[in-house]
């Protein structure tokens, strides 16, 4: 298995930056858009960067398989025995890319024994990169400024800050909160960028009551794990990785302060 160290992290960062440059080039022109079987959009940028990432990672780490959102039809029978693998989302926030909101990213995560252990989230237009590795910490790079992110404490002297997507029903989110619970919604693009905001304490949590894939959340597991945050499903159980036939996540909440009793806030049916 790969050794978790700064050299490995820097190799992955470089690949993420190279992928970001490709996304920038596609972003400057009109891209072809198609609908996938699940009715979500995919562009030529998704497909190109998926192939680029797969080739780069395979060339550097030939014994480590790659699972991409755009090539996720590998059978569970084949992948269930993987000891470690790369889980990638070449363009997290495809709809934001199409809508030209700048809020999209490339996401690379190393999963070992069903646990994400290294992650890089790079948003090229925002010049923002989040990266984390087990027992190393979580960092945010904005332009040339690098900051190590630390433990967050949820402050209930003010409204709860909840990150949601642009298409998320805020009333639906309110329905799982106590009646008249004070909160404010922060609308952000891709799932990975929302997880970065949770990790740095810009929001208290991110609620997702819609469909996502394991590639959308794996990176957040490392970011939040290193800053004492957490991700849980509607039963307050952790998400799983490569342990089921499906790669689709259940509904979930990401929180920046895992020490708080979130069961007293979120009231799932």
From Swiss-Prot:
Keywords: Cell inner membrane, Cell membrane, Hydrolase, Magnesium, Membrane, Metal-binding. Mg(2+) 1 binds at residues 69, 89, 91. GO terms for cellular component: plasma membrane. It catalyses: adenosine 3',5'-bisphosphate + H2O = AMP + phosphate. It is found in: Cell inner membrane. Its cofactor is Mg(2+). It comes from the Bacteria. The keyword Zinc does not apply. Mg(2+) 2 binds at residues 89, 92, 216. GO terms for biological process: 3'-phosphoadenosine 5'-phosphosulfate metabolic process; phosphatidylinositol phosphate biosynthetic process; sulfate assimilation. GO terms for molecular function: 3'(2'),5'-bisphosphate nucleotidase activity; magnesium ion binding. The keyword Cell inner membrane applies. It is a peripheral membrane protein. Its EC number is 3.1.3.7. Substrate binds at residues 69, 91-94, 216. InterPro entries: CysQ, CysQ/Inositol_MonoPase, Inositol_monoP_metal-BS, Inositol_monophosphatase-like, Inositol_monophosphatase_CS. Converts adenosine-3',5'-bisphosphate (PAP) to AMP. Belongs to the inositol monophosphatase superfamily. CysQ family. This is 3'(2'),5'-bisphosphate nucleotidase CysQ. It comes from Haemophilus influenzae (strain ATCC 51907 / DSM 11121 / KW20 / Rd). The lineage of its organism: Bacteria, Pseudomonadati, Pseudomonadota, Gammaproteobacteria, Pasteurellales.
């Amino acid at each position: 298995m790969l050794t978790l160290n700064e050299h490995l992290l820097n190799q992955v960062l470089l690949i993420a930056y190279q992928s970001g440059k490709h996304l920038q080039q596609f972003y400057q022109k009109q891209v072809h858009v198609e609908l996938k079987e699940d009715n979500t959009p995919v562009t030529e940028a998704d497909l190109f960067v998926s192939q680029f990432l797969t080739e780069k990672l395979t060339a550097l780490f030939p014994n480590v398989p790659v699972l991409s959102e755009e090539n996720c039809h590998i059978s569970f029978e084949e992948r269930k025995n993987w000891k470690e693998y790369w889980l990638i989302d070449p363009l997290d926030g495809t709809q934001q890319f199409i809508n030209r909101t700048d809020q999209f990213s490339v996401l690379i995560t190393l999963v070992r024994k069903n646990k994400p252990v290294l992650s890089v989230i790079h948003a090229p237009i925002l010049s923002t990169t989040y990266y984390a590795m087990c027992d190393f910490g979580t960092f945010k790079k904005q332009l040339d400024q690098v900051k190590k992110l630390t433990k967050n404490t949820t402050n209930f002297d003010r409204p709860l800050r909840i990150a949601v997507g642009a298409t998320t029903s805020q009333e639906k989110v309110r329905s799982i909160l106590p009646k008249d619970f004070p909160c404010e919604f922060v609308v952000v693009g891709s799932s990975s960028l929302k997880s970065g905001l949770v990790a740095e304490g810009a929001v208290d949590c991110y609620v997702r009551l819609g469909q996502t894939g394991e590639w959308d959340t794996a990176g957040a597991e490392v970011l939040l794990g290193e800053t004492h945050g957490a991700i849980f499903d509607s039963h307050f159980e952790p998400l799983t990785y490569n342990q089921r036939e499906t790669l689709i996540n259940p509904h979930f909440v990401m929180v920046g302060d895992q020490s708080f009793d979130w069961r007293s806030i979120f009231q799932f049916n």
